[in-house]
């Protein structure tokens, strides 16, 4: 069965994020006040798996082995 997976990778709290800071400052130059800005990478994958749980397990392996550095990143997985 085919499952659609959405994986969102963000930096863990406390990690420096120069990209987010640059965007936040640019937003301030536009006249808007922001308290916080988070950047993320999002991946949409279609996987073949026996069931939803297997699809999620496969997505976890993809995150841990390829997409995310567990020292600095956290990830969220949605399976449809």
Regions found by a protein language model. Give the residues of each.
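Long, contiguous binding/interaction regions
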Residues: 1-80
């Amino acid at each position: 069965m085919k499952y659609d997976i959405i994986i969102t990778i963000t930096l863990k709290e406390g990690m420096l994020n120069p990209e987010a800071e640059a965007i936040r400052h640019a937003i301030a130059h536009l006249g808007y006040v922001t308290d916080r800005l988070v950047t993320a990478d999002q991946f949409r994958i279609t996987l073949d798996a026996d069931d939803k749980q297997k699809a999620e397990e496969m997505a976890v392996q993809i995150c841990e082995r390829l997409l995310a550095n567990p020292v600095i990143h956290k990830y969220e997985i949605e399976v449809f």
